[in-house]
């Protein structure tokens, strides 16, 4: 005699497909939320990497990489010593001090070859930034 097809006597057997689709819907929504949260808002920047080298006396070399989501006509730059979206004209003409890269109360001067700028604090300390 051939075996008879088995039927489930569990009451939640019909709920399993529904639960499975709910689970996958939740997973898709969660992954979309994670993807959305990792996007930057337009016109903002974040620091991705920051390396400091203090091996030389009285001198610290810092390198940072920023990720920016700039609007049309803007490009990644520096404002008040933080990454920011600035007018692309500033970068194109190398007028670095126009983007206000120094902190409040510091003076900004272009390097002679326009490869960067210096920020001079009232006490005389000088911070030099070069663009690469």
From Swiss-Prot:
Induction or repression: Repressed in epididymal adipose tissue of diet-induced obese mice or leptin receptor-deficient mice.
GO CC field: cytoplasm; extracellular space
Keywords: Cytokine, Glycoprotein, Secreted, Signal
Glycan-modified residues: 113
Annotated tissue distribution: Expressed in the subcutaneous, brown, epididymal and perirenal adipose tissue (at protein level).
Compartments, as annotated in UniProt: Secreted
Protein name: Chemokine-like protein TAFA-5
Gene: Tafa5
